[in-house]
Amino acid sequence: MCGIWALFGSDDCLSVQCLSAMKIAHRGPDAFRFENVNGYTNCCFGFHRLAVVDPLFGMQPIRVRKYPYLWLCYNGEIYNHKALQQRFEFEYQTNVDGEIILHLYDKGGIEKTICMLDGVFAFILLDTANKKVFLGRDTYGVRPLFKAMTEDGFLAVCSEAKGLVSLKHSTTPFLKVEPFLPGHYEVLDLKPNGKVASVEMVKYHHCTDEPLHAIYDSVEKLFPGFDLETVKNNLRILFDNAIKKRLMTDRRIGCLLSGGLDSSLVAASLLKQLKEAQVQYPLQTFAIGMEDSPDLLAARKVANYIGSEHHEVLFNSEEGIQALDEVIFSLETYDITTVRASVGMYLISKYIRKNTDSVVIFSGEGSDELTQGYIYFHKAPSPEKAEEESERLLKELYLFDVLRADRTTAAHGLELRVPFLDHRFSSYYLSLPPDMRIPKNGIEKHLLRETFEDCNLLPKEILWRPKEAFSDGITSVKNSWFKILQDYVEHQVDDEMMSAASQKFPFNTPKTKEGYFYRQIFERHYPGRADWLTHYWMPKWINATDPSARTLTHYKSAAKA
């Protein structure tokens, strides 16, 4: 996890513009660099480094002697870089995984390059010989990327929007900043004056497609057919491989552990893989909650069962409320469920950075979207509609859960790894017949639970524990986090303010006092940027008025059982 930043065709002083890049310094606390592009006085790269691989030669922009005309600034991890290096007999100058991008590009061009990458990434690639700039982002947008571009060809790119909003340009007082779409790459022409012109934006991969790099994978051979035992066996193979490939790091590995199915499966599988790799330190797991939190109790059971070095972080409602301003600034969103869920993740990331030496942190993000884990999937009209909803959620991950996971950890200089969003695992899961993936017997993620039932990875009560949203599970059932927040904002936002909400916030007008309160904080940090959030996250098919799972009928009936 790093912070990348670049300008092309700036008409303001670069030394002044570069101050904006310091707003993402948290993403790379180990080192930083600014570098002007040879022959272009108005183009430069900025880079903040979190040293995870090759601490000696890993600074960016990456340039190698063989390709003096190529400049690469990227944030991410390319898990198959060694396999590709060996396959094509590339001669590396560094041990940095991102160097593979330069070699692949020289060999086959940008489309073949990006389709061959197994990993998570956001990159800026400059080819001064052919006068081209390329931007690219991974399938699910696990690594963030934002851009601003003017009609006259000024281009600014950054890992987070906050690194772009204060940039100056002569043609506009207000730069339009927008997220770069996941699963896409863009080709731009570089003009002699340093400005650019967009040539094409290409969607190179859809989440349901098996990735091109699969033909070079070293995964065990998968078995054909969709009978249950075959599918379960294939899922176990792919999940183990998703964990194993993500062990690539020179820093200590830890794992977030809520005690729910997803994080527990990741933690148990991760610990098994670390033992097999003969890693010489215990796995640290981390749980957070208030007193009487069901998550804390469940996480403790898992940690005791798998034998991790477990850390519990307690916080109270006052600490959670006080963190809201920092959280919304870090997130760059005002989405209600995202803000709620981010507080606990932000506070535990702060604890990890301050009190441990774990830097690479595994987590269970992406499973709910992929495996139909949200409780409202019980109300899906048909397996096909559930499949459509699952794919929609995956496409929008970069606006919600993936955004939350990246920003809350990156704010404290941590790198998050999410094996459920592995290309091979997710594309295989999405290829299964729709009726295999729906909730069964009143239990969501039934197939995933069945897959690991006989593996002794987890206690049965954890493997079959009902879904509990992270923002709910950190507090007791009697005093949910969403209720604590709603009670607090009741005294911060009055009825008169709500009646004028549509005039003050005509776009995405908040419907609740909680939403109004978050929007106020967001506008204070990012005035006029409300369109970064296209819509609020809400459950489907159930006419919900609040995104909390604890407001749903299915949850209430399950809680009484």
From Swiss-Prot:
Q: Which GO terms describe its molecular function?
A: asparagine synthase (glutamine-hydrolyzing) activity; ATP binding
The record's listing under SUPFAM superfamilies reads: Adenine nucleotide alpha hydrolases-like, N-terminal nucleophile aminohydrolases (Ntn hydrolases)
Q: Which reaction does it catalyse?
A: L-aspartate + L-glutamine + ATP + H2O = L-asparagine + L-glutamate + AMP + diphosphate + H(+)
Q: Which Gene3D superfamilies match?
A: Glutamine Phosphoribosylpyrophosphate, subunit 1, domain 1, HUPs
Q: Name one GO biological process term.
A: L-asparagine biosynthetic process
Quote the protein name from its UniProt record: Asparagine synthetase [glutamine-hydrolyzing]
According to the entry, every stretch annotated as the Asparagine synthetase domain falls at: 213-536
Modified positions (Phosphothreonine) are: 545
Q: Where does L-glutamine bind?
A: 49-53, 75-77, 97
- Keyword annotations from UniProtKB, A to Z: Acetylation, Amino-acid biosynthesis, Asparagine biosynthesis, ATP-binding, Glutamine amidotransferase, Ligase, Nucleotide-binding, Phosphoprotein
* Effect of inactivating the gene: Mice carrying a gene trap insertion in the gene express 20% of the normal level of mRNA. The hypomorphic mutant displays a number of defects that mirror ASNSD syndrome, although the phenotype is milder. Mice have structural brain abnormalities, including reduced cortical thickness and enlarged ventricles. Mutant mice also show deficits in learning and memory. Mutant mice do not show abnormal motor activity or seizure activity.
Which residue numbers delimit the Glutamine amidotransferase type-2 domain? 2-191
Summarize where ATP binds, as residue positions.
256, 288, 363-364
Q: In which pathway does it act?
A: Amino-acid biosynthesis; L-asparagine biosynthesis; L-asparagine from L-aspartate (L-Gln route): step 1/1
| InterPro entries recorded | Asn_synth_AEB (IPR006426), Asn_synthase (IPR001962), Asn_Synthetase (IPR050795), AsnB_N (IPR033738), GATase_2_dom (IPR017932), Ntn_hydrolases_N (IPR029055), Rossmann-like_a/b/a_fold (IPR014729)
Q: What residues bear Phosphoserine in this entry?
A: 557
Q: Where is the active site?
A: 2 (for gatase activity)
Q: Which GO terms describe its cellular component?
A: cytosol
Q: Where is this site: Important for beta-aspartyl-AMP intermediate formation?
A: 365
Enzyme Commission code: 6.3.5.4
What is the protein's species of origin? Mus musculus (Mouse)
Give all N6-acetyllysine modified positions.
385
